Design a protein with these regions (language model features):
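Conserved alpha/beta-hydrolase "nucleophile elbow" surrounding the catalytic nucleophile
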Residues: 29, 88, 92-94
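Flexible "cap/lid" loop of the alpha/beta hydrolase fold
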Residues: 101-106, 110-149
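Catalytic active-site module of serine/aspartate enzymes centered on a nucleophile-bearing elbow/loop
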Residues: 241-282
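Conserved acidic catalytic loop of the alpha/beta-hydrolase fold
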Residues: 71-88
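Conserved alpha/beta-hydrolase "acid-adjacent" motif
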Residues: 224-230
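Conserved HGGG/HGGXW glycine-rich cap/lid loop of the alpha/beta-hydrolase fold
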Residues: 6, 10-65
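Short beta-strand/loop motif that positions the catalytic acidic residue
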Residues: 211, 217-219, 223
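Conserved alpha/beta-hydrolase catalytic His-Asp/Glu region
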Residues: 123-134, 145-209
Length: 282
């Protein structure tokens, strides 16, 4: 479908597939809507699936600025307005999950029926005096330095951690890792680095209290990118009535490694009148 203008000189690439209940997918950093291939191949048969490339990523325009969560939330509202969307199940992965939280906090839930947070990088990542359990600033500084010096090499290492690849575990082929790498390299260098600043510095703890729709949180307990204890448990505690499903030992990239059960849980949640049962899956 055509690009949708969300701000002066900013147009976002949007795919609109299928029919039925509306499900909007927000991709993670530093990928694009194509990361949801293994979800859309199945869910697109039953639902209207809308996929958006965030500004700076995929096939969307790549402006110099606007990578903070407020601006990204405003981009979403512009897309929803252009398509006249209502009764949305909003699905956000990683940075996309944080973006979804800020969207509801900033624009309300009049368009949103349900929220799904997949490995969401929220509510807070950075260690600060009032958040001693957070990640040291030096970790994010090193990410930025490595990305600036050799983004391709950084992604090769990051991708292995992302999917839990090690000497004893190879949950995906080298070709699929190459595909993942290619999606990441379609982002602009500016968006790549500025987004690290955004997801590392953001504090969405107060936003959680504004989530007033049924919410399903799915997270891998083996996530080395967005640690389960730091994020999933905090979101579950902060979002009233939320449900948490923990994929035992699953990595951050469980949208691929656990895609059959993820698709089943998404379908159950989208079609049910209440959230599905909280559980831990191995």
């Amino acid at each position: 479908m055509p690009m949708i203008q969300t701000a002066p000189n900013v147009n976002l690439h949007v795919e609109d597939w299928g029919h039925g209940q509306t499900v909007v997918f927000l991709h993670g950093w530093p990928l694009s809507h194509q990361m949801f291939e293994y979800q859309i191949n199945q869910l697109g048969n039953d639902f209207r699936c809308i996929l958006i490339d965030r500004r700076g990523f995929g096939q969307s325009d790549k402006p110099w600025s606007g990578y903070d969560y407020d601006t990204l939330a405003d981009d979403l509202e512009a897309v929803f307005e252009a398509l006249n969307l209502e009764d949305i199940t909003l699905v956000g992965f990683s940075m996309g999950g944080a973006e979804a939280i800020r969207y509801i906090s900033r624009h309300g839930s009049r368009r949103i029926a349900k929220l799904v947070l997949l490995g969401a990088a929220a509510p807070k990542m950075l260690k600060t005096p009032d958040f001693e359990e957070g990640i040291d600033k030096e970790v994010f500084d090193e990410m930025i330095e490595n990305a600036i010096q050799d983004r391709a090499a950084f992604m090769e290492s990051f991708g292995k951690d992302f999917f839990g690849v090690n000497l004893l575990n190879t949950p995906l082929s080298s070709r699929l890792l190459d595909w993942f790498h290619g999606l990441a390299m379609k982002s602009s260098p500016r968006a790549f680095v500025n987004s690290i600043l955004t997801f590392s510095q953001a504090d969405l703890r107060a936003d959680l209290a504004k989530i007033d729709v049924p919410t399903l949180i799915i997270h891998g307990t083996g996530d080395k990118t967005v640690p389960f204890e730091l994020t999933a448990k905090a979101m579950h505690a902060g979002i009233v009535g939320s449900q948490l499903i923990a994929y035992e030992e699953a990595p951050h990239g469980f949208f691929y490694t656990e895609w059959p059960q993820l698709n089943r849980h998404l379908t159950e949640f989208i079609t049910s009148s209440v959230a599905i049962e909280e559980k831990v899956l191995s």
